[in-house]
Amino acid sequence: MGKREDICVVGDPAQTIYSFAGATPAFLLNFTKKYPDAEVIRLSAGYRSTPEIINLANTILRSGELGHDLDAVNSHGELPKSSAFTSESAELISIAEKVGETIKSGINPQAIAILARTNAQLEAIEDALNLVGIENQIRTAERFFERGAVREMVAAIRSGSVLSDPKGDWLSELRDLLKQFGENDKFARALIQLAYELSSDGIDSMRAFLRELEDRAEQNNPPALPGVTLATLHGAKGLEWDWVFIAGASASNLPWASAPIEEERRLFYVGITRAKRSLSISYAGEPSPFLREAGLVSA
């Protein structure tokens, strides 16, 4: 930077979870020491979650090094729930049952996420959901529009848009075009669902839809995939769902043994604040110390 002072920095020290990549809260917390004339604008209103969820998140942070509180502005909802199990298999069976009940009550599976500390946990959760026929998808680091299958679909749409009748039923044409990839292909279904949503917002041709896809690819703004989302706590950062289940919140997983405990606290905070309306946390065996600090289990 040299002597320049025209700089704007945006960040949340409570969500700094990548110290292994060199990111720590100190960069934000000590910014005014390096730039004493900087104006600090704190955004403390929590617009995503219910007050009950935000209160839990605040409690987690207050027990650590960061005294960072969010102010709830939404209407009240249900209290976050904590469930204990004697084994991981019993925990997974229960989660699958509860997710199934939530879907049967009329909740869109895309509004539900199950979060865990590691990818290995997600694979076990995936197996449990598959056993009872609950459609799901593991969120990976690979970007939607960079997937080989999606690239092929976009290429097919690009070719189809050349011959598409501008005054015809482009949605039917799109469905027929993507049938070659399989009627149950989750990526094709995501693109078709997006097309129907955009048609209500003024997208009226396959050419216009193609332009929208190209814009979204550039902005990394993918459509929602069908089914319940499974993601690691790291992978969930920046996302939100109405119903969130945090699985495997045991002492052996949270905090992770080789990770700094304060960063693990922030990681748990990130997971909690992904939930908009409902939050359920479960564990097998000894609970995470973070749950004890939050009063979700007896000391």
What function would you assign to each model-found segment?
Residues 126-128, 147-299:
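Conserved helicase C-terminal RecA-like lobe
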Residues 24-27, 49, 91, 121, ...:
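Short phosphate-engaging motifs
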